[in-house]
Amino acid sequence: MLQPKRTKFRKMMKGRNRGLATGHKVSFGEIGLQAVGRCRLSARQIESARRAMTRHVKRQGKIWIRVFPDKPVTKKPLEVRMGKGKGSVEYWVAKIKPGQMLFEMQGVEETVAIEAFALASGKLPVKTTIIKRTVM
């Protein structure tokens, strides 16, 4: 699963998820899956969506993952009283803003790519839309 190799600090504050995304265009592939809402995508969810897409296209073409889980989420163990410091890092998340491109695909038929993105969007906790590359 995806997570940073090393970070400056082990734990991070929760923060807020406001504003719009900057990476909102199809940059690498021909067709992309774009987030409509905002959420926190865990590394497990990203991997699950990637596997669903890869299996559907039968390892043809190329898939780009445009998000990376770089924010640690901590959790205290069960049945532990409050206080005594912050819990240990449980998993990693990527903060998703509206308009952010999640996945891109190239080298497969458009109908197959749309079906693969539909499978992947079922694994994600955010509404998505499919965007095609516009040639200038």
Curated annotation (Swiss-Prot):
Q: Which domain of life is it from?
A: Bacteria
Statement: the UniProt record of this protein carries the keyword NAD: no
Q: Which cysteines are joined by disulfide bonds?
A: none
Note one Pfam family from the annotation: Ribosomal_L16
The family database entries (CDD domains) matched by this protein are listed as: Ribosomal_L16_L10e (cd01433)
Instruction: Kindly list the GO CC terms recorded for this protein.
Output: cytosolic large ribosomal subunit
Q: Which SUPFAM superfamilies match?
A: Ribosomal protein L16p/L10e (SSF54686)
Question: What is the protein's quaternary organization?
Answer: Part of the 50S ribosomal subunit.
Protein name in UniProt: Large ribosomal subunit protein uL16
Tell me the organism.
Vesicomyosocius okutanii subsp. Calyptogena okutanii (strain HA)
